[in-house]
């Protein structure tokens, strides 16, 4: 995990530990040499330095090793949202246009309709529509006890994806595929393939 915004130490000109160029995370900046200099030369290949935690290997590993950062709020990755096909839209079985409306804070999405008779799960609402519903919920004569829950942005998408039971959805899709034809069948197969890949790799 990258925990510091620093890149290179201006005095030593070495990458800062836990920073964006950290050798412990991405690998050594010099072939066969750890950060602190305890291990040098190819004969120490594969050793992880007990002082600085850097593996003694070739510097080219820095080209493909990946780090990560923890964000304060969820974000949607453009590859999964805008890629062709859009994996997020396929998983949620929603048009990409609707998914974009949620991500770009143009519309709220219903996460739980509660006792409200006119709302449905995954229904989109404009801000004005949601304000009207809120007035209705909090009116004195309101009979709604179980209040509806709505969300917006990537946080709402995260909740929708967490609500999916991939194994159950896959089983349901297989049954639907057996009884469908043409374009509808092709669409169901495409969704099943994406879900099966997530199940096979245990990705969440």
UniProtKB/Swiss-Prot annotation:
Annotated positions binding Zn(2+): 34, 36, 49, 52
Superkingdom: Bacteria
Any one Gene Ontology BP term: DNA-templated transcription
GO molecular function (one): DNA-directed RNA polymerase activity
Keyword Zinc (UniProt): yes
EC code: 2.7.7.6
Gene Ontology cellular component terms for the protein in this record: DNA-directed RNA polymerase complex
Chemical reaction(s) catalysed: RNA(n) + a ribonucleoside 5'-triphosphate = RNA(n+1) + diphosphate
Cofactor(s) annotated in UniProt: Zn(2+)
Cofactor note (record): Binds 1 Zn(2+) ion per subunit.
Entry keyword set: DNA-directed RNA polymerase, Metal-binding, Nucleotidyltransferase, Transcription, Transferase, Zinc
Keyword Magnesium listed: no
The protein's assembly and partners: In cyanobacteria the RNAP catalytic core is composed of 2 alpha, 1 beta, 1 beta', 1 gamma and 1 omega subunit. When a sigma factor is associated with the core the holoenzyme is formed, which can initiate transcription.
Job description of the protein: DNA-dependent RNA polymerase catalyzes the transcription of DNA into RNA using the four ribonucleoside triphosphates as substrates.
Family: Belongs to the RNA polymerase beta' chain family. RpoC1 subfamily.
Protein name (database record): DNA-directed RNA polymerase subunit gamma
Organism of provenance: Synechococcus sp. (strain WH8103)
Gene (UniProt): rpoC1
């Amino acid at each position: 995990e990258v925990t510091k915004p620093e890149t290179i130490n201006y005095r030593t000109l070495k990458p800062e530990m836990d920073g964006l160029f950290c050798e412990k995370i991405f690998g050594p900046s010099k072939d066969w040499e750890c950060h602190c200099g305890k291990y040098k030369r190819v004969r120490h290949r594969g050793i992880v330095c007990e002082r600085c935690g850097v593996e003694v290997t070739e510097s080219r590993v820095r080209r493909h090793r990946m780090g990560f950062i923890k964000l304060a709020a969820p974000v949607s990755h453009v590859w999964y949202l805008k890629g062709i096909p859009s994996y997020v839209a396929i998983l949620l079985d929603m048009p990409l246009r609707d998914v974009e409306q949620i991500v770009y804070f143009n519309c709220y999405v219903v996460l739980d309709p509660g006792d409200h008779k006119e709302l449905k799960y995954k229904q989109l609402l404009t801000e004005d529509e949601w304000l009207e519903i809120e007035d209705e919920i909090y009116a004195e004569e309101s009979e709604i006890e179980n209040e509806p829950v709505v969300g917006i942005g990537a946080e709402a998408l995260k909740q929708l994806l967490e609500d999916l039971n991939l194994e159950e959805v896959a089983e349901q899709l297989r049954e639907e595929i057996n009884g469908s034809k043409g374009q509808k069948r092709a669409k169901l197969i495409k969704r099943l393939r994406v879900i099966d890949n997530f199940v096979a790799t245990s990705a969440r």
